[in-house]
Amino acid sequence: MLGKEEEQQYGQNGKGMENELPFMKRPWFKKAYENAIEFHEKDELLDARDRLELSKAYRSIAKAEMWGGWLGFSAVFLTPFAYRYYKTKAIKGVKVPRNFVLGVMALFFATNFAGRSMYTRQLNERDPTGVLKDNYSNKYGDNDFGAFQHDQTKEIPRNQRQYNMMRLLDSGSPSRWSMYFYITYQNPERRLPDPKVKLQQMKKGGVFNGSPFMNQRDPIGLYRNKGRKSPDPIEGEQNDSPVLSSWEKIRNGDNSSSSSWENIRNTSRDQSQESDASVDHESDIFISGFSDDGNATDNSSSDDKYQRLLQSGRYGGNRS
């Protein structure tokens, strides 16, 4: 139910914009608007620790639904096979389609039962005496949210804040709420926006962009370095030269316009020329090595002849 001041304000705003926003008079919109305000009031009271604990609580509910559902399916689907094998040592004769349909039905019932059981367990952990259950009220506007300040989070016990939020959300979509509370625990700015502000923006004709959590490019935080502007490859150095057609490139002798086969032939020709050059270089080295050896032998033979002439001259002089 709306407070008196909020009812008057809501009525005045609605009357002023009846022609522009006719859907605001419908019951489904009023109900959704009330639920959004109630959620926003309770969400503003949560601190980082509350969000982390609520994320763990709803994650445990999601796990309970998963394991409970598959255990129920396995129990109904596999029991006839086990019984048949125990009696006849074979699994022939079991009606598989019937077992599968019954297993799917058991999957849904077991999922709901396991999730509800874990949800009740999480509530009892936050309200072991049952006092919060007796004093719980799901009517928004009771705590004068317009005068809300952050210091009021200390006045409400932690278990009561978490209990009120879980009673409001119930046990539906536990995976989504677990992700929401964990992401807002890491970054509080990604909380759902104030529905009153969004309603005023819609009335003024502004564009409704949705919440920073549900309507964005990266809701789960997969991308890093948010806010950094990526360089635009188009804004780089621009080539002012005119664009030439293929025939103009051929006339100008542009090699870049050659076909792929011509590029392959050119590369193979270059490789063959390089291999021939390397072979010539090796042969030059080989020949130069032999020439050096020949010069060395020639020099050694001339030295021997010179020594022999000297010795013969000495001996001839002595004899004379």
From Swiss-Prot:
Superkingdom classification of source: Eukaryota
Transmembrane portions of the chain: 66-85, 100-119
Record field: compositional bias (Basic and acidic residues): 267-284
A GO cellular-component term linked to this record: mitochondrial membrane
Phosphoprotein keyword on record: yes
Region of interest: Disordered: 205-320
Record family assignment: Belongs to the PUP1 family.
Further details from the record: Present with 922 molecules/cell in log phase SD medium.
Species per Swiss-Prot/TrEMBL record: Saccharomyces cerevisiae (strain ATCC 204508 / S288c) (Baker's yeast)
Keywords: Membrane, Mitochondrion, Phosphoprotein, Transmembrane, Transmembrane helix
Biased segments, Polar residues type: 253-266
Regions annotated as coiled coil: none
Record's protein name: PUP1 protein homolog
Modification Phosphoserine, positions: S230
Localisation per UniProt entry: Mitochondrion membrane
Keyword Mitochondrion recorded: yes
Membrane topology: Multi-pass membrane protein
